[in-house]
């Protein structure tokens, strides 16, 4: 969102520009990744993702969090470090079983604005565009009920849930204490990304499975 437009949106929502930014993916700039910005200060998500692990288009989702009139989506779900919902003790969902796309994919032309800007979205419904439309004519949204998805429920003692809780705390606190030292969140996530990349490149499936309790 351009700075001028961000001011308008923030005013409409009765937020300060900083409060609005904190609710967007760019709010993790300097925490989970280093953002690339244009000359006017606009967050450039596409250029940022060339050097950072983020989901520009697409998001994970918790079927419980998006339910009801007060359902919500978390900006952190657009980070690869979010895999579970600590509040509801379940794994996040990533793909819509109806349209086959990642949630919140919306557009296929690399634009980040919602396809159906004229619609008031419901948090618990999939707004991805359905396929099969003729050129120049969009089909309606997928509209699948995300709240009906069945994802793996996690035991409170699950190491996955414990790891996710740790990551969530780092994102919120912007630092982490390791071996008695205060480590900035951005450094923590750089190391985590490097370790993850090494695992993906060099580890065999058996080696990874053996790490899971």
Residue ranges and their predicted role:
Residues 1-81, 86-213:
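C-terminal accessory regions
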